[in-house]
Amino acid sequence: MGYPGKNTKGYEAPKRPFEKQRIEDETRIVIEYGLRNKREVWRAQSVLRRYRKAARELLAFMSQSSDEQQIATKKEHLLGHLNRIGLLGPDADIGDVLSLKIQQPLERRLQTMVYRQGLARSPKQARQMVTHGHIAIAGRRVDIPSYRVPRDQETLISYYGTSPLTSEGHPEIERINKKRR
């Protein structure tokens, strides 16, 4: 057993807690994506903040350094990572990292993907299905709604093998099949 390290928050709360416009925007996002609370919005904002900071540091490094190989390596590392997790396309540039919106990391959540693929009627139901263990990625049960689905796994989302939702007689499956016809 090692030293567990210092516990730190994965988000930063807003500086002004009672800013009307921000509260309305966050509430709209919470409803649209079926999030549990505003903390999940702040966590997504923190993720974006880290990527933007890395892009700004890379731009500063590009203006200071003349080592083209090191610049290319750092740029390829950042853009490759964002491409693998699905936030950017394969032909993206550093400017695209700076223009990322809050919706993009929220669209990569398992809960949102389950809803968008039609496996659930609403984002809230998608969250419930994930937490109850009815959803699998490549045959492995995933019960974390905030799991960030990598680009190569987004087509592998399905119902878990032993879930009652896999039987043809289940009302939810009948509803989905009727909707697809």
From Swiss-Prot:
One annotated GO biological process:
ribosomal small subunit biogenesis
State if rRNA-binding is listed as a keyword. Answer: yes
Q: Which domain of life is it from?
A: Archaea
Stored PROSITE patterns: RIBOSOMAL_S4, S4
Q: Which Gene3D superfamilies match?
A: RNA-binding S4 domain (3.10.290.10)
GO terms of molecular function: rRNA binding; structural constituent of ribosome
One GO CC annotation, please? small ribosomal subunit
Xref: InterPro entries: Ribosomal_uS4, Ribosomal_uS4_arc, Ribosomal_uS4_CS, Ribosomal_uS4_euk/arc, Ribosomal_uS4_N, S4_RNA-bd, S4_RNA-bd_sf
Tell me which Pfam families the record gives: S4 (PF01479)
Q: Where is this region: Disordered?
A: 161-181
**SMART domains xref list:** Ribosomal_S4, S4
Keywords carried by this UniProt record:
Ribonucleoprotein, Ribosomal protein, RNA-binding, rRNA-binding
Q: Where is the composition biased (Basic and acidic residues)?
A: 169-181
Tell me the ranges covered by the S4 RNA-binding domain, including all copies.
108-177
According to its UniProt record, which protein family does this protein belong to?
Belongs to the universal ribosomal protein uS4 family.
HAMAP family linked to this entry: Ribosomal_uS4_A
Function, in words: One of the primary rRNA binding proteins, it binds directly to 16S rRNA where it nucleates assembly of the body of the 30S subunit. With S5 and S12 plays an important role in translational accuracy.
Instruction: Describe the subunit structure.
Output: Part of the 30S ribosomal subunit. Contacts protein S5. The interaction surface between S4 and S5 is involved in control of translational fidelity.
**What is the official name of this protein in its record?**
Small ribosomal subunit protein uS4
